[in-house]
Regions:
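Conserved acetyl-CoA-binding loop-helix of GNAT-fold acetyltransferases
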Residues: 118, 124-137
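C-terminal "cap" of GNAT-fold acetyltransferases
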Residues: 174-220
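Conserved acetyl-CoA-binding loop of GNAT-fold acetyltransferases
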Residues: 161-171
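Conserved acyl-donor/pantetheine-binding loop and adjacent beta-alpha core of acyl/acetyltransferases
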Residues: 56-59, 63-117, 123, 173-192
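Short amphipathic alpha-helix that is part of the acyltransferase structural core
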Residues: 2-66, 70, 75-79, 84-85, ...
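Conserved GNAT acetyl-CoA-binding A-motif
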Residues: 139-152
Length: 220
């Protein structure tokens, strides 16, 4: 069971603001951490990486997107893997570096990771920097079938495009929700000018897989 805790280390399971969803029989606990928003630098991005090259049930990974994208409104996620990581926290100081390296160096390369999420406020930390520096290399980017990304930092979008990932836009309702959330924080003009969100698919993938992904996203 994944237990989300706040920066004081207290469990927030019974907090009224918690949303509980189930994924493959596991309870996933969410907790609002609005007090962290003031510390967040929204020039950085919330990034999700979804590996689709493995032989696991692709529908499980696709279904997880609905849960995955609810995190944009919570300022608390460091690293999450749906099946391999059982417990993570909202504070980077509580993350174990070796756990991140285990995810990246061993599991990602053999296609076992369903999803990796890095919150913007962690990107300035040592752990986030290590992950993002690896993602900026040709070798790292070529290991992924698709990158699901949201950013108001154009540099990340340009990096994806430079590595020939094709952008597929997310449903408009998600963009509207993001706008509603971030407008009071950074203003509508800044958001609309800089926001980029979409699924970036590498052109090496067969058409059937691409159409399946498009169809799954359209159903969200």
């Amino acid at each position: 069971m994944n237990k989300w805790v706040n920066t004081r280390g207290n469990q927030i399971k019974n907090n009224p603001s918690i949303q509980i969803q189930e994924l493959k029989g596991e309870e996933i606990h969410y907790g609002r951490a609005d007090h962290l928003l003031e510390k967040s630098d929204f020039s950085h991005q919330l990034l999700a990486v979804l590996t689709l090259s493995n032989e696991r049930d692709k529908s499980v990974a696709i279904r997880s997107l609905d849960t995955l994208w609810s995190y944009y409104r919570y300022s608390m996620v460091s690293v999450l893997d749906w099946e391999l990581i059982a417990n993570t926290t909202c504070h980077p100081a509580e993350m174990v570096p070796s756990r991140l390296h285990l995810l990246w160096d061993e599991h990602a390369k053999i296609g076992e990771v369903s999803a990796v999420v890095v919150h913007p406020f962690h990107q300035n930390k040592k752990i986030g920097t290590q992950l993002f520096s690896k993602m900026h290399t040709d070798v790292a980017l070529q290991e992924f079938d698709a990158i699901i990304g949201w950013t108001i930092n154009p540099s990340m979008k340009h990096i994806w495009e430079r590595h020939n990932y094709e952008k597929i836009a997310f449903p408009w309702k998600l963009y509207e929700e993001w706008l509603a959330f971030f407008e009071p924080l950074i203003g509508r003009e800044v958001f609309e000018k800089n926001a980029h969100c979409g699924l970036f698919i590498h052109p090496k993938h067969e058409k059937a897989k691409e159409e399946k992904i498009r169809s799954a996203l359209a159903s969200l």
